[in-house]
Amino acid sequence: TLGTVTNVEGNFTLMAPENSTLVASFIGYTPVEIPLKGKKIVVFKLVPDAQSLEEVVVVGFGTQKKASVVGAVQSIKPAELRVPSSNLSTSFAGRIAGVISMQRTGEPGADGANFWIRGAATFSGTTDPLIFIDGVEVSAGDMNAIPSEAIENFSILKDASATALYGARGANGVILITTRTGKDLEKARINVRIDNTFTAPTRTLKLADAVTAMKLRNEAILTRNPDGTPAFSDDKIQGTLEGRNQYVYPNVDWFDYMFKDYSMNQSANLNVMGGTKKVDYFISASINNDNGMLKKDPNNTFDNNIQNLRYSFQSNVGAWLTSSTKVNVRINSQIVNYNGPSTSMDNLYKYVMEAPSMYFAPVYPNINREDHTIFGNKSGGPIGSGGFSIYRNPYASMVQGSSKQSAYTINTAFELEQKLDFLTKGLNFKALVSFKNWSKTTVNRSFSPYFYELQNPQEQEDGSYLYDYNSISKGRTALETSTSTTGDRLMNLQATLNYQRMFGDKHDVGAMLVYLQREYNLNNPDNNYYNTLPERNQGLAGRVTYAYDGRYLAEFNFGYNGSENFEKGSRYGFFPSLAVGYLISNEKFFEPLTKVISNLKIRASYGLVGNADIGSNRFPYLTKVDLGGAGFVFGDQWQTSSNGATITTYGAEKVTWEIGKKYNVGFDLGLFNKLSLNVDFFREDRKDIFLRRNTIPAESGITGDLRPYGNLGKVRNQGVDMSLDYNHAVSKDFM
């Protein structure tokens, strides 16, 4: 097979045998084949492929034509998600209207962004959106591990009409990701990407040096009391200014001593896709190596810097068993190996901010040939008890141990698609079963630092100093080891019956019914009895759509969901939504304007959403009793106490669903088939938010965690989303 590409004017040159057949193809156009038969010049005329040009948007449990969408749904091209980062969520900021994204840390392994769809509409439980990849619920960590090269479609569902199918669990918005397949390819395609990136802080705080800090401290003391005694002598300040000796007159820049200016990270992705009329496949393998910015201690046998090494694998295989039956098998797995200091990066940064720069050096020379590192410190600091206290040495905290973590994730899904045209045209059935298992093992090893205080410094004739040390905190050279394991399992079951049919030339009717079931378990539950029980959710959802002549659009959605968090009689909630749209640009009277205004659609929606998440407090309607209570005294037997049952939390029998009313009005405007503007005005009124009751008098003895929950809170969340896009192929005729 030979191939070539045209220039910007459409001309091409290709050396080919005389009996060859030339094939010309372009995205959005129907391929054309012309037998060569000895011809020297061949002219191709491609015609638009109406089906390819009809853009499709991924919505809840299916797809819709973009022109028919009446909900607040935004799609983003996978290419726009490609950023020099190992986490997909870091690409959201500034690219998706209505999504608030915040990266709280750049620490490898923890640098995924927190994000909210249209802000936070509740202050109980989670505010995170629901995330689905290929119809399977996943965590934000699973989403972050998906390389952008593996993504086919990426959609954000914002309003009630778009999220109602997910019921209570979609109250905070939904993210839908579809991975790639090879179904449109006859020949295998191999793609390789290798990146090397630099990471550096955008800004660091500039702390005062030792001389400035000492002068300011003395100034503060004398300002309060002119007769007061300065904290630092003139000799101390002058010796530090002149840099006479780094141990006697320390001037430590803890940031520079512990952190590098930048780090280098590597990533690579290899994917293969292809297929035939019977079988299609997509296989992707990725590796990401992210490094921290800590400097290595040459005295340690281990590297205390952070390294987060992640391996990701994605496999999608589909096969047509018959002309109407297809099965899809999808497997996603991740292996994450983390190595870093035993002290968290948050604490290390905090310690650097708090550490004095003038009292002690990070380490002292081992003049007495001790069998351990001589870490600097000074008595009289803020840490300690019983009349003895020292300061924090952040360098000792950084190098005193290491933490190794190994995490394994496996997501598997089996899907069956069955066309039911033999019953009625446009009817099909889909069943999906998925299973996820995640486990994590952590091993921490650390020693206890030996801290010394420099004393009796004596300057010699040659300007050098003699001094000795006083041990102020004895440590331990032997490594102490601790381990922990955690993990969870998630199983989902979905059954979808979908109907889509055009009646005549003007009536486009669609309907869908979905059954959902979910079970979540902890692999290593603690002693809390509730954590040993599986979390189960069940629901029924439906959608009905109607479009008349491609101009008048209507959609009704509902979710009927059950939650174990409420008592019988209150466990199920019904959450409907209604949306309408008017595609003005498809009207006949609008035809003279279509060369300028290529698209104009107005839409509106209203619906209810529910929330049953009360954080970690399960079964709030039950009164929780601890049978291990002690210290009970009865009658005049005040010298004798007894054991017995203790109420830890009073139940709230009437607690029920948190309800939100969502309103959305928007319009889509297209100009010259190049410029598109999408604007949405939204408001959500959330009521019956879960809160502990604070109005119970303390004299009743019901205080703290004893207080029951109630549907008490209210939140109003409103704003505007806007996105502006310009798409045009660059050529000599740019405009």
Predicted regions and their residues:
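Extracellular/periplasmic, surface-exposed regions of secreted and cell-surface proteins
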Residues: 127-128, 262, 316-324, 330-335, ...
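Short, small/polar-rich motifs associated with maturation and membrane association
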Residues: 1-314, 326-327, 386
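Long amphipathic alpha-helical scaffold regions
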Residues: 348-357, 576-584
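Active-site-proximal polar cores
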Residues: 451
